[in-house]
Amino acid sequence: MYSSYSLSKRLVSIPILAIQLLLIRSVSSLNLTNDYLNHKCLVSQGKYRPGDKYEDNLNFLTREVLSYNFPTGFIHISYGEAPSFVAIILQCRGDSYDSKCLSCYATALSGLRRRCQRNKGRVIWYDQCFLFINSIRSSPRKNDYRNVFSMHNPNNMIEDTELFNKKTRDFLYELMLEATTPNRTMMLYAAGEKKLGTKKLYAMVQCAQDILRCKGCLEWSINELSKCCHGKQGARVLGTECTLRYELYPFLRS
């Protein structure tokens, strides 16, 4: 599917065996791909030591997440005071709510434990969710493009590249407007398909449900496509505030 990705130039240890045993069953039932995409250890936020108050707060929150059923596929919870303040933000893809979101949480939690051991700030992206653990209080969140990266399908469009790019941008703008209409503000998500000659274009846009300017984030991401992914048959732009993707094959649950 994807053989390469590029990071934008602007661009835990959680010893809870019970959580992992509880969640592993739901992970195995996930039929669609949930590949690891990228991660970032936020070294500027420092690290915590085993047994300190930050670790206690982190373990409390990771257990607390299990009490949610994720009807909209999103959670932003926090606990404690600086320097032991912890926030967890989990945003699942719009078609991955309820138990499917919990499955992605288990995968992401395990992934962060391996890749960013004891970092207070860290984020990881998978096909179906991103998990952001943070030690800085910020709610609602402003758009921050430092933790953004892009990926693209290795295959290029052979003909009518400019027309394909234009129609793709236009379709993404349509979905952006749909996702940000007043009756969709709880999900901030839209997906669809559009016929392009003999082909079909599949696309989705989504914002995390705690950001101030969803439309501004998606507009910025759509503009990034011309820099990273010109003429590509598929691409994504992912961050901690919003994400978008398009392909010439279906990649979402119906």
UniProtKB/Swiss-Prot annotation:
Report which superkingdom the organism of origin falls in: Eukaryota
List, alphabetically, the InterPro entries matched. CRR_secretory_protein (IPR050581), GNK2 (IPR002902), GNK2_sf (IPR038408)
The signal peptide, as residue positions, is: 1-29
Q: Does the keyword Lipoprotein apply?
A: no
Any GO CC annotation of this UniProt entry: extracellular region
Repeat as a keyword of this entry, yes or no, is yes
Q: Any idea where the Gnk2-homologous domain is?
A: 36-138, 145-251
The cellular location(s) given in this protein's UniProt record come to: Secreted
In terms of Pfam families, this protein maps to: Stress-antifung (PF01657)
**Keyword list, A-Z:** Repeat, Secreted, Signal
Fetch the PANTHER family from UniProt.
Answer: CYSTEINE-RICH REPEAT SECRETORY PROTEIN 29-RELATED, CYSTEINE-RICH REPEAT SECRETORY PROTEIN 38-RELATED
Q: Which family does it belong to?
A: Belongs to the cysteine-rich repeat secretory protein family.
For this entry, the protein name equals Putative cysteine-rich repeat secretory protein 37
Phylogenetic classification of the source organism: Eukaryota, Viridiplantae, Streptophyta, Embryophyta, Tracheophyta
